[in-house]
Curated annotation (Swiss-Prot):
It is found in: Cytoplasm. The keyword Lyase applies. Signal peptide: none annotated. GO terms for biological process: heme biosynthetic process. One of its GO terms (cellular component) is cytoplasm. The lineage of its organism: Bacteria, Pseudomonadati, Pseudomonadota, Alphaproteobacteria, Rickettsiales. Its main location: cytoplasm. It comes from the Bacteria. It catalyses: heme b + 2 H(+) = protoporphyrin IX + Fe(2+). Pathway: Porphyrin-containing compound metabolism; protoheme biosynthesis; protoheme from protoporphyrin-IX: step 1/1. InterPro entries: Ferrochelatase, Ferrochelatase_AS, Ferrochelatase_C, Ferrochelatase_N. The gene is hemH. This is Ferrochelatase. Fe cation binds at residues 191, 271. Its EC number is 4.98.1.1.
Amino acid sequence: MNINKKRIAIVLFNLGGPDSLKSVKPFLFNLFYDKAIINLPNPLRYIIAKLISTTREKKSQKIYSLIGGKSPLLEETEKQKLALAENLKQATNEDFNIFINMRYASPKIEETIKQIKEYNPTEVILLPLYPQFSTTTTGSSVKNFLSNFNINIPVKVVCCYPVEENFIKAHTALIKEKIFDKNSRVLFSAHGLPQKIIDAGDPYSFQVEETVKAVVKELNIKDLDYKVTYQSRVGPVEWLKPNTEDEIEIAGKQNKNIIIVPIAFVSEHVETLVELDIEYKLIADKYKIKYNRTPTLSTNKIFIKSLTSILLKFINKKEDDFLVASSNGERICPDKFSKCLCFTSFPPMRESSK
């Protein structure tokens, strides 16, 4: 037995989703009760989360009924976990186990940490299934994990991987399969955020744009017609622009065919299967233009290779306490993005995320 052999707990973070129509309301409440989503003190945040989850329940249930009455996100993540484990077994001699933590649904933080404690690791690596960092996604999940994790072992956090080589190549390969003529416009659609979150120093839109720049460069298609757009806008506040729906309308009026690339989603879920595939397609159908979408990266071999490569870098990093870095081991965000997780010099373990 090699006493120096590591035991590594790898935690995959994602949003989560309802596993039945009955669980839609509690899922919505958990989402909007997160301080990273609605930054208001209690009891106001609690009241608003209750109000939103109640008023949106029936509409959201109708949406989920279109895809079998539940979110496919956990099942998708389980498949990614298995593919990643298979790759990693071939690449490292270290002992490891992969766990899943969903921020707003099961398996929630208590369940995940219980499983990790039973495994008894020597270190933990946190890997978000959000390629681009935001305080509302990776930031919230990391904070939630660290504020509940009380084992004194090294924790390594993968902040983001917006321009990781194989992540970019995976997208590029899928786009090349879908480009059907020179009259196509590629819309790189990412989940939107309120503009005020970006203005407060969140690097999300910067990282989305860096991803798109890298993909376009890798595509190497002369005079490629493309735009970065944002979807899923809700409420009266100003959101990131341009809006994906609006850009499909514009393309329709210009008789431009559309290729949608879900550039910030790595798993199929309600925003891709309903919003992109059904709701937005209706806009294209109205103008009788061709509408196509690349699949999410899911278990794409090049994408799994990307995640494997990232993990190997972090497995091989010597760290006695706490590490947070992008996939290349450094901070990639300019200093003006003060909410970048890589500015964190110590683990915020005692700061409440609730």
